[in-house]
């Protein structure tokens, strides 16, 4: 089989530092009577996947990205953290300054194959009034975004730093009226600041939350809608507002837990029927280790050209870099 790689520029994701799709790959080129996907069309749809996926991605724009596996073979990517220096101070004229050794810690992020595909028939391509390939690319784009965002979400929610709605101290005391409010935000900021978690761009912490959670917070008079300050800097994808030095990103990807799930995650003492999880974090909170950027691929000839498979494929992994830089919140 002849494999053709078609590169394209990730122009639609300039606002997401370090994020790019890879190449478009075709399993075979064939000049038979079936409707193949010509190079120009494949290139167009690879760009379409890139564009369509962007609005759904929330976590990727804040991840620390590394692609070392493209140069060094292996199944993991290592992120190196420098430990803080502990010495230093005033000196007398005759004091000898003894250099302090630098020390590091490693965060190992395993990578795995990721992907999904869909299949269309030759008959459908020839007879449908719809743009079948365009529809397929949109479905794949949305699926890729949901998968990637879900992996980031599940990674950061592994943190052991937990707060509860309305200042409650345990899941057992949480009630159906303990919403995500100003007390919740201040509790999270206190923990992050106490842990010396660096702010994003030295300016703010980030919270990614469900729309239900942010509804109550928006009623506070100190809440600032994103459209008020949008001219001062470029907004992040999904950013809806700011409060108390925290910017808020809204997404339905954040978990909505029933009572069984709440008790499974937080213990049998929890009594609320429905719970919502949100996450706060600062700089260098979590990692995205990429061995192969996302590609749009077609599977060539199947059943004499009667079927065509189109899918996305990549190799990556996610992991926590600094757990102290992450706080999760369970609220009603």
Predicted regions and their residues:
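Alpha-helical scaffold segments that mediate packing/assembly in large oligomeric complexes
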Residues: 123-195, 328-332
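Single-pass alpha-helical transmembrane signal-anchor segments in small membrane proteins across taxa
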Residues: 7-15
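Hydrophobic alpha-helical segments involved in membrane association or supramolecular assembly
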Residues: 79, 138, 142, 207, ...
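N-terminal "assembly arms/tails" that initiate or stabilize quaternary assembly
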Residues: 14, 18-110, 326
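Short acidic, glycine/tyrosine-flanked loop/strand segments centered on an H-E-D-like triad
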Residues: 101-128
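Sequence/fold signature of self-assembling virion shell proteins
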Residues: 21-62, 174-187, 218-332
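Extended amphipathic alpha-helical segments with heptad-repeat/coiled-coil character used for oligomerization
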Residues: 190-211, 215-217
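Feature marks short, highly hydrophobic, charge-poor N-terminal signal-anchor/signal peptide-like helices
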Residues: 1-7
């Amino acid at each position: 089989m002849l494999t053709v790689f078609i590169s394209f520029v990730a122009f639609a994701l300039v606002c997401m530092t370090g994020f790019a799709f890879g190449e478009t790959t075709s399993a075979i080129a064939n000049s038979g009577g079936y409707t193949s996907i010509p190079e120009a069309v494949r290139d167009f749809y690879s760009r379409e996947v890139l564009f369509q996926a962007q609005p759904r991605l929330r976590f990727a724009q804040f991840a620390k990205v590394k692609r070392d596996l493209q140069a060094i073979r292996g199944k993991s990517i290592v992120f190196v953290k420098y430990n803080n220096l502990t010495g230093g101070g005033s000196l007398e004229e005759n004091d000898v300054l003894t250099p302090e050794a630098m020390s590091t810690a490693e965060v190992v992020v395993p990578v795995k194959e990721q992907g999904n595909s869909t299949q269309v028939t030759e008959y459908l391509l020839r007879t449908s009034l719809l743009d079948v390939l365009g529809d397929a690319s949109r479905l794949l784009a949305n699926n890729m975004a949901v998968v990637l965002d879900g992996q980031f979400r599940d990674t950061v929610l592994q943190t052991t730093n937990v707060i509860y709605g309305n200042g409650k101290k345990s899941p057992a005391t949480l009630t159906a009226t303990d919403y995500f409010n100003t007390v919740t935000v201040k509790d999270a900021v206190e923990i992050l600041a106490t842990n010396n978690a660096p702010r994003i761009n030295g300016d703010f912490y980030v919270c990614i939350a469900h729309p239900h959670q942010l509804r109550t917070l928006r009623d506070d008079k100190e809440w600032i809608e994103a459209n008020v300050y949008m001219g001062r800097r470029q907004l992040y994808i999904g950013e809806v507002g700011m409060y108390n030095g925290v910017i808020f990103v809204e997404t339905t990807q954040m978990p909505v837990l029933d009572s069984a799930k709440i008790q499974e995650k937080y213990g049998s003492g929890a009594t609320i029927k429905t719970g919502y999880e949100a996450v706060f974090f600062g700089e260098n909170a979590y990692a995205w280790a990429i061995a192969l950027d996302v590609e749009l691929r077609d599977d060539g000839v199947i059943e004499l050209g009667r079927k065509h498979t189109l899918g996305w494929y990549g190799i990556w992994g996610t992991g926590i870099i600094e757990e102290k830089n992450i706080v999760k919140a369970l609220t009603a």
